[in-house]
């Protein structure tokens, strides 16, 4: 059984806040490798700037994840009318709001690319935008396990997957402990 792991970092950050604990990415890799050949592991993250979360991203890479990033979109707090004309002041810059970086396309491209040499996908996300991707992967014969948190996963996505695992049920296996940065597997 060949397995691929895909982690929507934005979705999982909020899911972990909801359950009240954070998982250790290394423990997740180890769990995903049990009973299967873990052929790829992807982590998707939005960034405020290119240096944002650099140590964390480096640690993920050292563990064996392929890390994909996109900049967060920034919106002005005043509706953007002045900033659209090039006028800005300190009040506006203090009211900046960052919104989600949409990495759904990257997730889809990666999973469709590895699909021909994969039997199973573990997807950690709650995004409704991925439901059609999951349907297509299942139509290609892949088994899809969705891991997320009750109340933070779109019904359409959950219904599209073969199996749903509530993140809270994995706490004994995944909860963050002491940092370890040895690779769990080698990317091929």
Predicted regions mapped to residue ranges:
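Terminal and domain-boundary accessory regions
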Residues: 1-188
